[in-house]
Amino acid sequence: MIATYRESPAPGPLSSHACCVWANVAGPGGHLERVLPDGCADVVWIEGEGIVVAGPATREVLVDIPAGTAALGVRFGPGAAGAALGVAARDLRDRTVALEDVWGAPATELAERLAGAPPAGRLALLAAAVARRLDGAQAADALVARASGLLGAGMAVTAASREVALTDRHLRRRFHDAVGYGPKTLQRVLRLRRFLALAETGPSPDLARAAAEAGYADQPHLTRECADLAGLPPAALLAARAAA
């Protein structure tokens, strides 16, 4: 077994800020995880290490997980983490910071409670603690959320700006504050995600068709973007994901 990973919708009040919660346990041989950018940010508890905020990434992150290590997380969709955590998302871009630097002593206390809790109850404990902390937190930027959805569906940045009645410049500024980077970068990230979803449907992926349907100009365009964002060419990335 390489790892055991499970993901579920954010429960109760937490769902107004977060998109999901997740739990992972590395297998007996450990695991090198290639985490791809997705526009999201996570509050993550790692057994033996404490709690961190993993900010929105613009490239792949390789995480070496020792054998048997448990990790839990609360994931915030594009544009949600900054408002919920009370920090500018631009300050979290491509960074992992201790939650204590954001929340102070309550983060340390929560980490201690998680370390001492029964494994089966840890995810619920983390979700409940984050939900309490976010009670009354600022809502995410609704225009950024709407524009993110349009970009995820394949709309061009300029067209998305018009749809939300903002200039390209104003949309970029709001994206940097809320998402951590501009709409063009999020568009690239979400396009790669669309390609992977298309290519991983069915037993024999048609890379050319998946690339075209995802919105790439041609296969060289896909290859460049895949190498830049994921660190591997398309076929190698798909093979690595299939073996994980």
Task: Cite the ranges covered by each PLM segment.
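Alpha-helical bundle regulatory/interaction domains
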Residues: M1-D168, A178-P183, A197-G202, D206-A217, ...
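DNA major-groove recognition helix of helix-turn-helix
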Residues: F175, Q187, E225-A227, L238
